[in-house]
């Protein structure tokens, strides 16, 4: 008697979840199909009833990991009245927990350098994840700011977030917390202390496509 569809779907999800955690924790090349199935509590032979290869599995594992990061960054801000939620999200990303648990965190920080070395093999998946994160962070910026300033903020913030996490994981354990605190200070200065000096708020209700020069920040002489 064949297994019900729900059982097969649940088994597939177990494999994807186990792979997403293992790849981020140990690296794609360091994890075998047998390792993944053991982590999922399943037999090795059952893998090919769901996936054609480990490469095929990685694509779904990256999507699973991306969903986890999206949920992590959508945590409510400390100040619900604040229109700018980018800084709280960046602080959550650069947290001690995220630092210590790559298996539950950002796939770009955990796997990005490794996947880049594969050339075009997984480039589409990596690009999609970076774009997804940029879009999410853009929505967390203050709508009072001009679109150009918002784009600059998310580019700088994501670079600091991903780069900061990679560098912190490469440091001695005794140095990691201090380094994260310095990243926090930098982001706070860049995202909070520079406003409203660094940008002139746009009028409420003005769509980005109709944004005029009169509302843009003036260039310094």
Predicted segment positions?
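Hydrophobic/aromatic-rich alpha-helical bundle segments in the mid-to-C-terminal region
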Residues: 120-128, 140-202, 210, 218-219
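Secondary-structure edge/capping motif, primarily at the C-terminal ends of alpha-helices
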Residues: 76, 115, 168-172
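Hydrophobic alpha-helical connector segments
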Residues: 60, 74-105
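Alpha-helical DNA-contacting segments of helix-turn-helix folds
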Residues: 51, 58-65, 72
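Short helix-capping/turn signature of helix-turn-helix
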Residues: 51, 110-117, 159
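Helix-turn-helix
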Residues: 14, 22-56
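Amphipathic alpha-helical segments that line or abut small-molecule/effector binding pockets
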Residues: 17, 83-98, 113, 155, ...
């Amino acid at each position: 008697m064949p297994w019900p569809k729900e059982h097969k779907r649940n088994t597939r999800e177990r494999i994807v979840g186990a792979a997403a955690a293992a790849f981020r924790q140990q690296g794609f090349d360091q994890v075998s199909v047998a390792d993944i199935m053991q982590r999922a509590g399943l037999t090795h032979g059952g893998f090919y009833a769901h996936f054609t290869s480990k490469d095929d599995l990685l694509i779904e594992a990256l999507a699973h990991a991306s969903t986890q990061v999206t949920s992590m960054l959508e945590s409510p801000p400390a100040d619900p009245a604040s229109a700018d939620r980018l800084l709280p999200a960046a602080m959550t990303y650069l947290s001690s927990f995220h630092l210590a648990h790559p298996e539950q965190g950002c796939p770009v920080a955990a796997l990005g350098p490794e996947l880049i070395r594969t050339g075009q093999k997984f480039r589409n998946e990596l690009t999609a994840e970076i774009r997804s994160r940029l879009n999410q962070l853009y929505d967390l910026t203050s709508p009072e700011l001009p679109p150009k300033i918002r784009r600059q903020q998310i580019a700088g913030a994501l670079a600091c977030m991903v780069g900061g996490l990679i560098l912190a994981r490469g440091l001695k354990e005794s140095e990691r917390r201090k380094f994260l605190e310095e990243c926090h200070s930098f982001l706070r200065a860049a995202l909070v202390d520079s406003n409203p000096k660094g940008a002139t708020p746009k009028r409420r209700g003005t769509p980005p496509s109709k944004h005029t020069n009169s509302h843009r920040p003036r260039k310094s002489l």
